[in-house]
């Protein structure tokens, strides 16, 4: 064996109890597991004393914003050091593909607070396929440090096809968005994300989202929404997501699903009951969450939706105009 991890605590992901063992690796693959007191110890060209350490399958980060970080840091130690081996990026409806030149400039400006401005990255892609090829190339041609799966950002798609206007998409604009989603799925995306408290994605109505989810379902993908409300309207926002994906026949993964605002204290069982009812009816639903009450967003998300119409430049102009304040 090339490597033996001696006396490591194995947490194998099956749900069973952990156990101590020697674990052998040959040519990058596990080639032997010898439990404690299970006979002779494994031997190999290199032996590491792993007593007191844990060994587990790589973790999947279902909600990551490493869209540019993967291209900046060849080691990606912020995630790799935590045991993450797969990240799902393209989250919250805003990322960097599919785009044209104008859309790329706008989305870079819009989410600088999430990912930085991307200085030092050449942004030589426009389609999802080209972006995934860029990830394969990675940092200086060496690939990226972890695996990545990409969600099509619905807000970026709407920015591309409709712009920043707070209105329903026209038939031609909807057809354009559906075509972009289909092409992106064919190029390797795994689903569609939304950020329905962020502009311009929030301007999409249920009918528009349902049509896009139908396209995603045709490729066996899933819809991952940051839904419309985390406050008093949270449960209704979850109901909207469940209903429209059932209508579209699309799998649903609820992003950072919480009831952690004060107004929702004690209401988590209502959310679970909603999801259980949908699951019993045959829906394909999963979620990710976190065990603490704070959250993180951008200051622009605190603005009323009317103040965000038109994009970043229009927002800045309104902020400079005292007469534009809501009374």
What is the predicted role of each segment?
Residues 1-21, 26, 304-327:
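Active-site microenvironment of metallo-dependent hydrolases
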Residues 169, 178-308:
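Functional cores that coordinate and move charged inorganic groups
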Residues 72-190, 283-285:
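Divalent-metal coordination cores built from histidine and acidic residues
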Residues 8, 28, 52, 63, ...:
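Divalent metal-coordination and catalytic microenvironments
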Residues 99-121, 129-132, 155-159, 163-167, ...:
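Polyanionic/metal-chelating signatures
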Residues 1-2, 10-58, 73:
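Histidine-rich, glycine-flanked metal-binding segment
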Residues 54-78:
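Di-metal (Zn2+ and/or Mg2+/Mn2+) metal-binding site signature of metallo-dependent hydrolases
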